[in-house]
UniProtKB/Swiss-Prot annotation:
Pfam families: CTE_SPB4 (PF13959), DEAD (PF00270), Helicase_C (PF00271). Residues 124-300 form the Helicase ATP-binding domain. The gene is HAS1. Belongs to the DEAD box helicase family. DDX18/HAS1 subfamily. ATP binds at residues 137-144. SUPFAM superfamilies: P-loop containing nucleoside triphosphate hydrolases. GO terms for cellular component: nuclear envelope; nucleolus; preribosome, large subunit precursor; small-subunit processome. PROSITE patterns: DEAD_ATP_HELICASE, HELICASE_ATP_BIND_1, HELICASE_CTER, Q_MOTIF. This is ATP-dependent RNA helicase HAS1.
Length: 559
């Protein structure tokens, strides 16, 4: 989708590249350096024309109790299906005509739903009829309701009671997605007598075991914690299992739960069990998992025609070509100019997220951070706080890239490039959600990474090239370097972030695109505030060459 034209008076500097822009994008004279580091950053921010937000503002915000937040923030967004979907012959898009039970219909009405999305309309009828389903759908398509509604109806029709134990298990890759699914399940089961629960890593295991012993009819779980309870919780009754849902199967396998899933499938009873497996992509590993979990002859449902683009219609997508040493300067400028927007910034490693969030908060640009090394309570609080915010910035790893329904996100910034087109699609899927959703995305690429665009084109992802004119980018490099040099804690955090960035870069699967040998380590170091890159020993490639040796070679080449 082509980017909208912008006037000079608009505050967002993002626009489509033109030859005239490129010719005129020379640096303007920088203001005289200011003595104190904090004052330096404040003046640059002032030159950008945006007031600095109170750094304590977010800490002072009153937070709701967990129960209230679960009810409010996990509620699915209501949107009508398009006419093209509703007019498809032979497909029922009406919840009223789907023959749901009275308690379920009452909950659906209270949640505000009237028409099904395409994936719901295609998937719910065969699931209600007891078929096993292997489903593929674009992110944000309403898949959660597509498997939850038949699961709730199954519990109702069998008149399952808490003493019968767990009859439905839903497995999902991340804790945040599990929390979201659990919240929706609770709303759907509001007028049912059956019980629902959740078990996730990082939560109180003893508390979970107590609830399981009392009887949880519908259980939402992450793989590792579920396997733990299956093996070690004596009061966990699961012999009456009637339905198994595996959501985001490709992601579950990508993050290393292949062995756990095989063990779970082996432990769970499979007699008369209905299985629903959803995956955005059909990899060999997903096919293997489907083979051992689904009954013979499952129904395959794909609601994404190959000719369609892989991302949402309301999403404007672009990329910017930027040398490594200018990456943070560009990010800082962009965030300051869009301080009133709701933005997610994706990075490739936990320590990089930690450093940049600490840095941005220190220079009075308030951000939240979310990554896999945080304690579960911190992750949950951060997730709900950002969901509830009308504006704000979330710096995160790909832990937030899949399935999460975060309301009204304006921008997705891929500061570190995604591993492959699937990761790109799931990252940008956090905005422009629902039928009428709108949003924008911007991906940072260095000149050596432009080959990734070929892969996106092959995956039917339309992108425009954008440019930030150089005179619109705040040159805070000297202030950044001074800050990292004088602040011990930030210096250590920057060093950890730098090392983690290189480790993540060397682990990319697209080796022809992300070639760590082509990285200019001096420029990479500058984006972390170092004049001279710190010494790190990371072995790269089959040759066993280390990052430190590569840095010495680059220094020799410059002499």
């Amino acid at each position: 989708m082509a980017p909208r034209s912008q006037s000079k008076s608009q505050r967002e500097p993002l626009r489509k590249r033109s030859r005239e822009d490129a010719d005129n994008s020379n640096d303007t004279n920088e203001d005289a350096a200011i003595q104190e580091v904090d004052a330096d950053f404040e003046e640059v921010a002032g030159l950008l024309g945006t007031d600095i937000a109170d750094p304590d503002q977010k800490q002072k915000q009153k937070q709701s109790k967990d129960e209230k937040r679960l009810q409010e923030l996990t509620k699915p967004k209501v949107s009508n299906t398009s006419e093209a979907e509703a007019d498809e012959p032979g497909v029922n898009y009406s919840f009223e005509k789907a023959d749901f039970s009275e308690p379920t219909m009452k909950a659906i009405k209270e949640m505000g739903f009237q028409k099904m999305t395409k994936v719901q309309a295609k998937t719910i009828p065969p699931l209600l009829a007891g078929r096993d389903v292997l489903g593929a759908a674009k992110t944000g398509s309403g898949k959660t309701l597509a498997f939850l509604l038949p699961a709730v109806e199954l519990l109702y029709s069998l008149k399952i009671k808490p003493r019968n134990g767990t009859a439905v298990i839903i497995i999902t890759p991340t804790r945040e997605l599990a929390l979201q699914i659990f919240g929706v399940a609770r709303q759907l089961m509001e007028y049912h007598s059956q019980t629902c629960g959740i078990v996730i890593g990082g939560a109180d295991r003893r508390q979970e075991a107590t609830k399981l012993a009392k009887g949880v009819n519908l259980l939402v779980a992450t793989p590792g914690r579920l396997l733990d309870h299956l093996k070690n919780t004596q009061g966990f009754v699961f012999l009456n299992l009637k339905a198994l849902v595996i959501d985001e199967a490709d992601r579950i396998l990508e993050i290393g739960f292949e062995e756990e899933m095989k063990q779970i499938i082996k432990i769970l009873p499979n007699e008369d069990r209905q299985t629903m497996l959803f995956s955005a992509t059909q990899t060999t590993k997903v096919e293997d998992l489907a083979r051992i979990s689904l009954r013979p002859g499952p129904l395959y449902i794909n609601v994404v025609p190959e000719k369609d683009v892989s991302t949402a219609d309301g999403l404007e997508q672009g990329y910017v070509v930027c040398d490594s040493d200018k990456r943070f300067l560009l990010l800082f400028s962009f965030l300051k100019r869009n301080i009133k927007k709701k933005i997610i910034v994706f990075l490739s490693s936990c320590n990089s997220v930690k450093f940049y969030s600490e840095l941005l908060n220190y220079i009075d640009l308030p951000v939240l951070d979310l990554h896999g090394k945080q304690k579960q309570q911190k992750r949950t609080n951060t997730f709900f706080e950002f969901c509830n915010a009308k504006q704000g910035i979330l710096v995160c790893t790909d832990v937030a890239a899949r399935g999460l329904d975060i309301p009204a996100v304006d921008w997705i910034i891929q500061f570190d490039p995604p591993d492959d087109p699937r990761d790109y699609i799931h990252r940008v899927g956090r905005t422009a959600r629902g039928t009428d959703g709108k949003g924008k995305s911007l991906m940072f690429l260095t000149p050596s990474e432009l080959g990734f665009l070929r892969y996106l084109k092959a995956a039917n992802v339309p992108l425009n090239e954008y440019e930030f004119p150089a005179n619109k980018i705040a040159n805070v490099q000297s202030q950044l370097t001074k800050l990292i040099k004088t602040n011990y804690l930030l210096h250590q955090s920057a060093k950890d972030g730098y090392r983690a960035y290189l480790q993540a870069y060397s682990s990319h699967s697209l080796k022809t695109v992300y070639q760590i040998d082509k990285l200019d380590l001096v420029k990479v170091g500058k984006s972390f505030g170092f004049d001279v890159p710190p010494k790190v020993n990371i072995t790269i490639g089959a040759s066993g060459k280390s990052i430190e040796k590569k840095h010495k070679k680059q220094k020799r080449d410059r002499k």
